[in-house]
Amino acid sequence: MSTQVAEQITFDPDVSWRLHHQVAVRPEPFGALLYHFGTRKLSFLKNRTVVEVVNSLADHPDARSALCAAGVADDQQAPYLHALGVLVQSNMLVPGNPEGSQ
C-alpha cells in the first residue's frame, strides 16, 4: 500500500502567492466559490475583499501588498491573513515563485 504525504507549506504574508493552476474561481453574490480540480475541494469566500485579494495575489510581490492594494489597512489585515493561510493549507494558493509552483 502506498501513501502520499503532501508537503505542508507554511503561509508567509511577506512572499509571493498565487492561485493553484488547478483552481477555478466562480463569482457568486456572496463572494466566490473556489474549486480545486486536483483535490476536488471546494472553498467558499464570503467576503468580496478576500475575493479581490485572492484574484490579485499574482500581481503583487507579497500578500500584504495585495491587501494594501485592496484597501485593507495594516491594522485590519489579521482576519484576511488568516483566511489566506487557510487557503494555503487547503492547497488553493501556492507560492508565486517558480520554484514553488505546482
Swiss-Prot record:
Deleted gene: phenotype: Cells lacking this gene lose the ability to utilize ethanol as the sole growth substrate.
Gene designation: mftB
Family recorded in the similarity comment: Belongs to the peptide chaperone MftB family.
Name this polypeptide is given: Peptide chaperone MftB
InterPro entries (alphabetical): MftB
Function: Peptide chaperone involved in the biosynthesis of the enzyme cofactor mycofactocin (MFT). Binds MftA and MftC with high affinity, and is essential for MftC activity on MftA, likely via the formation of a ternary complex. Is required for the in vivo ethanol assimilation in M.smegmatis.
Organism of this sequence: Mycolicibacterium smegmatis (strain ATCC 700084 / mc(2)155) (Mycobacterium smegmatis)
